[in-house]
């Protein structure tokens, strides 16, 4: 079972989710769509255990962890699939 980290458009670039993740699933990437100039991205979704610490840490309810069967992992925001 893998977990998909859905990233929505309310990221403020605070890095709280990145620091909260115990498995280093998230990272910040450059993005012009927010004031901070960076946005959370999830390049290592195969390592996500669904603990939801990133969701809890997020001050804007930006992240959502959803459980999928198989290798159905995605990154939203059009950054990659």
Curated annotation (Swiss-Prot):
Task: Copy out the cofactor comment.
Answer: Binds 2 [4Fe-4S] clusters. Cluster 2 is most probably the spectroscopically characterized electron acceptor FA and cluster 1 is most probably FB.
Report the residue ranges that make up the 4Fe-4S ferredoxin-type domain in this protein: 2-31, 37-68
Q: What is the effect of changing residue 34 to A/S?
A: No measurable effect
Please state where this protein is localized. Answer: Cellular thylakoid membrane
Q: Which cofactor does it need?
A: [4Fe-4S] cluster
Q: Does the keyword 4Fe-4S apply?
A: yes
Result of mutating residue 58 to D?
A: Unable to bind PSI cores (in vitro)
Residues where [4Fe-4S] cluster 2 binds = 21, 48, 51, 54
Gene Ontology BP terms? photosynthetic electron transport in photosystem I
Q: How does it sit in the membrane?
A: Peripheral membrane protein
**A Pfam family:** Fer4_7
Binding-site residues, [4Fe-4S] cluster 1: 11, 14, 17, 58
The record's top EC class is oxidoreductase
- GO MF term list: 4 iron, 4 sulfur cluster binding; electron transfer activity; metal ion binding; molecular adaptor activity; oxidoreductase activity
Location (main, coarse)? membrane
Q: What does this protein do?
A: Apoprotein for the two 4Fe-4S centers FA and FB of photosystem I (PSI); essential for photochemical activity. FB is the terminal electron acceptor of PSI, donating electrons to ferredoxin. The C-terminus interacts with PsaA/B/D and helps assemble the protein into the PSI complex. Required for binding of PsaD and PsaE to PSI. PSI is a plastocyanin/cytochrome c6-ferredoxin oxidoreductase, converting photonic excitation into a charge separation, which transfers an electron from the donor P700 chlorophyll pair to the spectroscopically characterized acceptors A0, A1, FX, FA and FB in turn. Mutant proteins with a 3Fe-4S center are not observed bound to PSI in vitro, and are probably not able to do so in vivo.
Q: Which HAMAP family match?
A: PSI_PsaC
Q: What is this protein called?
A: Photosystem I iron-sulfur center
Q: What is the lineage of its organism?
A: Bacteria, Bacillati, Cyanobacteriota, Cyanophyceae, Oscillatoriophycideae
């Amino acid at each position: 079972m893998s977990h998909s980290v859905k990233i929505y458009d309310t990221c403020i670039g605070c890095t709280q989710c990145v620091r909260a993740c115990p498995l280093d699933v998230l990272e910040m990437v450059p993005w012009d769509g927010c004031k901070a100039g960076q946005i959370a991205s999830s390049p290592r979704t195969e390592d996500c255990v669904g603990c939801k610490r990133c969701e809890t840490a997020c001050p804007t309810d930006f992240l959502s962890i959803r459980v999928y069967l198989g290798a159905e992992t995605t990154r939203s925001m059009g950054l990659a699939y």
